[in-house]
Amino acid sequence: MNLFSLKAEKFLNLKTLSDLKLIKIFRWDSSEKKDPWYSTYVVSLKNCGPIVLDALIKIKNECDSTVSFRRSCREGICGSCAININGTNSLACLQKLNIKNNIIYVYPLPHIFVLKDLVVDLTNFYAQYRLIQPWLQSSLNIKSKKEIYQSKQDRLYLDGLYECILCACCSASCPSYWWNHDKYLGPAVLLQAYRWIVDSRDDNTLSRLLSLKDSYKLYRCHTIMNCTKTCPKHLNPGKVIASIKKRLLNLEVLGEKRDLNS
């Protein structure tokens, strides 16, 4: 039997079965009046794909169809399968199964309301993203068929920003966001905000900056840097937030006429 459910690890000697992984999944349903619990499953590496998402799909298809989780691209592009694996926020489609630990603990993203099992409610997260107006705002005629020119140098300013997939791994790892998620925008949304602030094609740089000048929206960041450590795309939200603060400081000290894109 290569895939089965266990009630306790004591029924399996994992030290003698190195090709097996014990998967412990957090379970809870917000629609039911039950306390959270853990379901434990065993997956054989011999007939399962190499990543955690493969194991979750195998468990759902062959053992327990009630296990709920999000997934889509399987390539680290969409960010749908963001969960907490062994205490670290990551994408299930990027985290390998063949790690040193025989037991793999799988939780939903921390400090976000759980809908069911590994599925969290991202309503507030997306509402905050909408708040920064994440689209190009230009005074040029939008009906024109001619593209808005951007130099190669200006394009380079977007590197390390546009790659963000809004998986929420960074925001869910930030203690400041845990305590102030209703006011603090969090590292993911602030990184996205900076992506539009530095875009040379956008004409609303000043208003975008001023909209972040708030003791909670921006300044709850205390450079703990969990966001940078956990980002599956290897981005640096902490550095980006510091850059936003610096630009606002320059604006206050040197005045609005300063080149905000420098």
Swiss-Prot record:
Cofactor binding remark: Binds 1 [2Fe-2S] cluster.
Binding site for a ubiquinone: 179
Keyword Mitochondrion part of the UniProt annotation: yes
Residue ranges annotated for the 4Fe-4S ferredoxin-type domain, each copy included: 154-184
Cellular localisation: Mitochondrion inner membrane
Molecular-function GO terms, alphabetical: 2 iron, 2 sulfur cluster binding; 3 iron, 4 sulfur cluster binding; 4 iron, 4 sulfur cluster binding; electron transfer activity; metal ion binding; succinate dehydrogenase (quinone) activity
GO biological process: respiratory electron transport chain; tricarboxylic acid cycle
Residues that bind [2Fe-2S] cluster: 73, 78, 81, 93
Catalytic activity: a quinone + succinate = fumarate + a quinol
Gene3D superfamilies per record: 3.10.20.30, Alpha-helical ferredoxin
Pathway of action: Carbohydrate metabolism; tricarboxylic acid cycle; fumarate from succinate (eukaryal route): step 1/1
Described purpose of this protein according to its UniProt entry: Iron-sulfur protein (IP) subunit of succinate dehydrogenase (SDH) that is involved in complex II of the mitochondrial electron transport chain and is responsible for transferring electrons from succinate to ubiquinone (coenzyme Q).
Oligomer status and interactors: Component of complex II composed of four subunits: a flavoprotein (FP), an iron-sulfur protein (IP), and a cytochrome b composed of a large and a small subunit.
Protein known as: Succinate dehydrogenase [ubiquinone] iron-sulfur subunit
Species classification: Eukaryota, Rhodophyta, Bangiophyceae, Cyanidiales, Cyanidiaceae
Gene responsible for this protein: SDH2
